[in-house]
């Protein structure tokens, strides 16, 4: 029988390996898993709609979605693939916000940015993936008018929308724009929902709260969490 000391050393070894995995890697892997589960869930119901992503960065989430889109099927149990278009919005130049409330020690500058040409090259074989170079804060014009989705060639409701811009202002603007594409059953993913020290009056949490207050016909059900601070909701329209 092993001594408690030797057992503890084995536990320490395992924990050192596990805790040595960068948190960013774990977060992205859990996000990829969440995206896979959602695509599968939608396909079981044969639920139609496109995938939209705000905040493409280097394209890892979009690649997760692209793979999930073409692999979420099973002949054994009769789950058929639902062919979907995937759209990625990003400035491809860095974080954008015009309010001091979005000041953050990490989410600024161009650290998480890749040129759109590099992203397009990465997805050159994915004909159902489109990237749109756009500052999300301009999806709602100064007069309050919402830019029509048809301007970007989108003529279908959304099945999944990922908000990965971390900050309040662009996320609220993207939510307001997305209202025209929502349907009961649309999944909303927020990648940094508990940021800014957990202050619900900042970041993505504030954006969602304000959007729901202004759109009383839209309700959301809690679907779950992923990664370091990701949150998932399902839309219900009144």
Report residues per predicted region:
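S-adenosylmethionine/decaboxylated-SAM
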Residues: 5-26, 45-238
């Amino acid at each position: 029988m092993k001594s408690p000391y030797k057992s503890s050393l084995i536990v320490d070894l395992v924990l050192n390996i596990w805790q040595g995995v960068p948190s960013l890697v774990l977060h992205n892997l859990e996000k990829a898993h969440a995206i896979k589960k959602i695509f599968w869930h939608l396909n079981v119901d044969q639920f139609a709609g496109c995938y939209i992503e705000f905040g493409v960065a280097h394209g890892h989430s979009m690649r997760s979605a692209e793979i999930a889109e073409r692999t979420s099927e099973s002949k054994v149990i009769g789950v058929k693939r639902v062919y979907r278009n995937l759209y990625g919005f990003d400035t491809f130049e860095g974080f954008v916000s015009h309010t001091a409330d979005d000041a953050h020690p990490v989410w600024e500058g161009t650290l998480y940015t890749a040129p759109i040409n590099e992203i397009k090259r990465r997805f050159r074989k994915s004909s159902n993936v489109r990237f749109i170079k756009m500052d999300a804060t301009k999806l709602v014009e100064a007069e309050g008018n919402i830019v029509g989705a048809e301007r970007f060639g989108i003529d279908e409701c959304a099945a999944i929308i990922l908000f990965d811009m971390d900050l309040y202002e662009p996320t609220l603007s993207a939510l307001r724009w997305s209202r025209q594409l929502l349907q009961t059953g649309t999944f909303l993913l927020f990648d940094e929902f508990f940021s800014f020290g957990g202050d619900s009056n900042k970041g993505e949490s504030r954006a969602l709260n304000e959007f729901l207050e202004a759109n009383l016909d839209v309700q959301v059900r809690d679907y779950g969490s992923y990664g370091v601070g990701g949150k998932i909701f399902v839309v219900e329209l009144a």
